[in-house]
């Protein structure tokens, strides 16, 4: 699940011209600019290729521009993903393990990167197609297990999104209690390393 998010629905691209894709992408960018920060509760449902529910969960989700991300799964098994703009931390309390990754390498492989990026270079890597109140984001080159992300809005507010992977699984995330990040909430994006945990610092392995 963590890999599906970091690296977490189709309309045929033959039906759309490049100009339409560009317009759809700009519309999505404009909507996300209006969502410079967001905190919400989420409910998660994962279905397999046969549309059978294989996992459910709930927790807290937050994002802030630029490049800050918080994901706290509280049920059924606790886990955290925190991006502070430079590094991405994945914490598994049950395994007592923390994995640290370079943020850009971890998140850029996924269409979900567009939720926290505004730069042209990142957006040029994805095709965006509008579908009523939703936008499907697909990488132009498949470099990860994520095939697409669909984000949906209600009254200009991010309401839900889903992630489709190459195994045929679909992870649906429905948001509630949406609100802007407060000064107090900014602490969510600063990961505090717990005591007595194993640390797998993968930044060293990818350092130049």
UniProtKB/Swiss-Prot annotation:
Keyword Nucleotide-binding: no
SUPFAM superfamilies named in the record: Prokaryotic lipoproteins and lipoprotein localization factors
Record key words, sorted: Chaperone, Periplasm, Protein transport, Signal, Transport
BP term (GO), one: lipoprotein localization to outer membrane
Entry keyword annotation includes Protein transport: yes
Localization in the cell: Periplasm
GO cellular component, one term: outer membrane-bounded periplasmic space
Signal peptide: 1-22
Matches recorded under Pfam families: LolA
Subunit structure: Monomer.
Family stated for the protein in its record: Belongs to the LolA family.
Biological role: Participates in the translocation of lipoproteins from the inner membrane to the outer membrane. Only forms a complex with a lipoprotein if the residue after the N-terminal Cys is not an aspartate (The Asp acts as a targeting signal to indicate that the lipoprotein should stay in the inner membrane).
The protein's name in its UniProt record: Outer-membrane lipoprotein carrier protein
Organism: Shewanella baltica (strain OS195)
Gene from which this protein is expressed: lolA
């Amino acid at each position: 699940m963590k890999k599906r998010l970091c690296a977490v629905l189709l309309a045929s691209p033959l039906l759309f011209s490049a100009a339409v894709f560009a317009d759809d992408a700009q519309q999505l960018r404009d909507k996300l600019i209006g969502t410079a920060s967001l905190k919400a509760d989420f409910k998660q449902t994962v279905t397999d290729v046969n549309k059978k529910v294989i996992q459910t969960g709930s927790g807290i989700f937050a994002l802030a521009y630029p490049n800050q991300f918080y994901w706290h799964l509280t049920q059924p098994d606790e886990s955290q993903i925190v991006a502070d703009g430079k590094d991405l931390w994945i914490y598994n309390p049950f395994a007592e393990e923390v994995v640290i990754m370079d943020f850009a390498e971890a998140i850029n492989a996924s269409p979900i990167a567009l939720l926290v990026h505004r730069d042209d270079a990142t957006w040029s890597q994805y095709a965006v197609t509008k579908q009523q109140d939703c936008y499907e984001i697909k990488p132009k080159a498949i470099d990860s297990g994520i095939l697409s992300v669909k984000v949906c809005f209600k009254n200009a507010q991010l309401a839900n999104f889903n992630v489709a992977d190459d195994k045929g699984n679909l992870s649906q995330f429905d948001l509630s209690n949406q609100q802007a990040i407060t000064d107090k909430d900014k602490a969510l994006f600063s990961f505090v390393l717990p005591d007595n945990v194993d640390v797998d610092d993968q930044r060293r392995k990818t350092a130049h």
